[in-house]
């Protein structure tokens, strides 16, 4: 059977922007309160709790927090936490800036913040279980996926998947799949592939949709990852089984692949012989 071939990149790549100006992003999709309620909140009137995040205090209303956040609903309704529930202190993956945006979202159904805080807001929405904000943040991040952030977004999505919600769409999984598709299309341009996980690199290299300029480029990326992460030999060989050595030039096989120290083992040479055998059979 002929070896499978990957898609090839075109000779021109997407332009990259060097603009470092701060951009404000607006997320919407929530339910806005009547203007009078928002006015009372902004003036700090009739609040009955204080939420502390990273040393900052946010005057709030328990009813509003509990009605929009499953986390706070559980927190304030838990009798065993009654003593400490009055004025909660948030820890974990919630920054003060992200909570400020989330708090506004609960009242106004939308929030605006520095675009660089997008992943923080997504983490906060996921942790505090504010599903409409999480949905909006995932959609915004998907629109901004690029070779420079695809792997980081994929990793973030995998981390967020630890908080499943069976009643709703699996938003972290949706983000992970979109990030994977971006990585497949832009494999040659990916930033810091050596920071990826073994599972991610395995999924990319094994996928026929992976677009690369050559199989030599695929091997080089795998080699950078392996040299950085030093996986166990069995894991490395399992990963390399998805590299299509028969599509490489003889000179690259001889000068680069065969001389790569991480393949200079009995098992490594055995795998290489096995993988290039179809070429000479």
Task: Describe each PLM feature range.
Residues 7, 161, 182, 186, ...:
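Signature of small Cys/His-rich zinc-finger-like modules used by ubiquitin/SUMO E3 ligases
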Residues 101-203, 210, 231, 235-239:
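Post-BTB helical module
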């Amino acid at each position: 059977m002929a070896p499978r071939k990957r898609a090839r990149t075109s000779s021109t790549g997407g332009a990259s922007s060097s603009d470092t100006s701060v951009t404000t992003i607006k997320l919407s999709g929530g339910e806005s309160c009547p203007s009078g309620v928002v006015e009372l909140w902004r003036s700090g009137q009739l609040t009955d709790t204080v939420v502390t995040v990273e040393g900052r205090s946010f005057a709030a209303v328990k009813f509003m927090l509990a009605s929009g956040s499953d986390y706070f609903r559980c927190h304030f309704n838990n009798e065993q936490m009654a003593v400490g529930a009055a004025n909660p202190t948030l820890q974990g993956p919630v920054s003060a800036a992200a909570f400020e945006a989330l708090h506004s979202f609960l009242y106004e159904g939308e929030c605006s913040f520095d675009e660089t805080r997008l992943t923080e807001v997504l983490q906060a929405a996921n942790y505090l279980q504010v599903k409409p904000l999480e949905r909006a943040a995932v959609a915004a991040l998907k629109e901004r996926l690029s070779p420079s952030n695809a792997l980081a977004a994929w990793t973030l999505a995998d981390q967020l998947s630890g908080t499943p919600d069976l009643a709703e769409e699996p938003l972290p999984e949706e983000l992970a799949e979109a990030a994977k598709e971006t990585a497949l299309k832009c494999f040659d341009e990916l930033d810091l592939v050596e920071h990826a996980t073994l599972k991610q690199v395995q999924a990319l290299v094994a996928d026929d949709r992976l677009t690369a300029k050559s199989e030599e480029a695929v091997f080089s990326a795998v080699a950078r990852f392996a040299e950085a992460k030093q996986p166990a030999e069995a894991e490395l060989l399992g990963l390399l089984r998805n590299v299509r050595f028969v599509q490489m030039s003889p000179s690259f096989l001889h000068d680069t692949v065969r001389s790569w120290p991480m393949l200079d083992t009995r098992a490594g040479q055995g795998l290489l012989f096995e993988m290039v055998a179809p070429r000479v059979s």
